[in-house]
A protein has these predicted regions:
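Bacterial N-terminal signal peptides
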Residues: 5-16
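N-terminal hydrophobic/helix-forming segments and targeting peptides
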Residues: 17-360
Length: 360
């Protein structure tokens, strides 16, 4: 290599590394509207539409029969798949009582007590109807427990009144939510799990140069992860043995909070993306984990390694013999009405997805 070529290479590589990382404003501009879109498991349409609107113009997105949004780019082997899920925890109406209250069933795993006596929204498909999640009986005998079945009140007073409002069995409920900036680079809201993963995939795809790819990469925004990884399972079965490696892009439930002990899942916010080496559903092969760490170090992507609870979409590819290497970011207070994220970790996650797609 000539001195001039070497000099050009030394200049271009740092500039490219810098260009790969989205700005904090880029992160906010994608994440905030996704957070403020509603999509309980099975009703992800509004979130899928929001993602579609933010994809780069060259991306050709398709929706499969399950409702997964899919973008395929590049050709040849190995085939690498990234999966972030569209859905959020919430409730579905299972029955409407004569007194007009709505009986609810959970979609996803969370503590019901977090939602007692809080504002509610019923999503009818046409509009969102305000209501209230019922509290436990304040005059009942001790110990007072969460109501069974859990219910919501929209103020109707009768089943006929609920019907007149256009509310039906099968409609979903959530708590109202918004993206709220906190001090520094942190933010709070509900459904960062997994709108951060969705955001990181969008930001990576925007920076991806299809001409640089030497193989095929598929980006999936999956449905119904919170109720059994159902959308990802459809993708895994459709691709079968063709997939070489899958990367679930999802939350790392961190113990980095004022409340929790630090003996497990202690991955600090603001210190970068996370290689989710071990969770309840999958184990990253050690050789692949080591290779990922070396790649991140070489490309100067902040990366932590940890083990946590929960499962991930990539695990359903295991029945096809596909290794799952989950990519994550640390989150406080997961599956609560007020999760907390550091936007610098979202930057790092988007950058990590990009370098993995291009160079691994």
């Amino acid at each position: 290599m000539t001195r001039l070529a070497l000099l050009v290479t030394m200049i271009v590589l740092p500039m490219r590394a810098l260009a790969q990382q989205p700005s904090l404003d880029d992160v906010r501009s994608v994440l905030a509207p996704l957070i403020e879109s509603y999509g309980v498991s099975g009703m992800e349409g509004p979130v899928r539409d929001a993602v579609s609107r933010m994809l780069p113009a060259w991306a050709r997105a398709t929706t499969d029969t399950a409702g997964n949004l899919i973008v395929s780019v590049g050709e040849g082997e190995p085939l690498v798949v990234f999966v972030a899920h569209l859905d959020e925890i919430g409730f579905v109406i299972s029955a409407i009582r004569e007194d007009g209250t709505l009986e609810l069933k959970q979609r996803g795993g969370f503590f019901l007590s977090l939602f007692e006596a809080q504002p509610a929204l019923v999503h009818t498909g046409e509009r969102s109807v305000p209501g209230v999640f019922l509290p436990r009986d304040s005059v009942g005998t001790s110990p007072r427990r969460t109501p069974v079945p859990f219910r919501a009140d929209v103020g109707a007073g009768s089943r006929a009144g609920v019907d007149a409002m256009g509310i039906r069995v099968g409609h979903t409920l959530t708590m109202p939510k918004q993206f709220v900036p906190l001090a520094g680079t942190r933010a709070t809201g509900r459904s960062f799990d997994d709108r951060v993963g969705c955001t990181a995939q969008i930001l990576a795809l925007r920076r991806l140069d299809p001409k640089r790819l030497k193989h095929r990469v598929i980006f999936v925004w999956s449905v119904r992860e919170e109720i059994g990884l159902e959308g990802a399972r459809v993708v895994a079965d459709a691709l079968g043995l063709a997939t070489s490696r899958v990367h679930a892009v999802d939350t790392f439930v961190s113990s980095d909070s004022p409340l929790e002990i630090k003996t497990f899942a202690d991955v600090p916010l603001g210190s970068g993306a996370v290689a989710r080496a071990l969770d309840n559903s999958s184990v990253t092969p050690p050789a692949l984990a080591d290779s990922l760490v070396r790649l991140a170090a070489r490309r100067k992507v902040p990366l932590q390694v940890g083990s946590t609870n929960g499962g991930n979409d990539g695990s359903v590819f295991g029945s096809w013999g596909v290794p799952d290497v989950p990519l994550a970011w640390p989150l406080r207070y997961a599956h609560s009405p007020a999760e907390v994220v550091d936007l610098r970790d979202v930057q790092a996650l988007a950058q990590l997805i990009l370098v993995v797609a291009e160079d691994w």
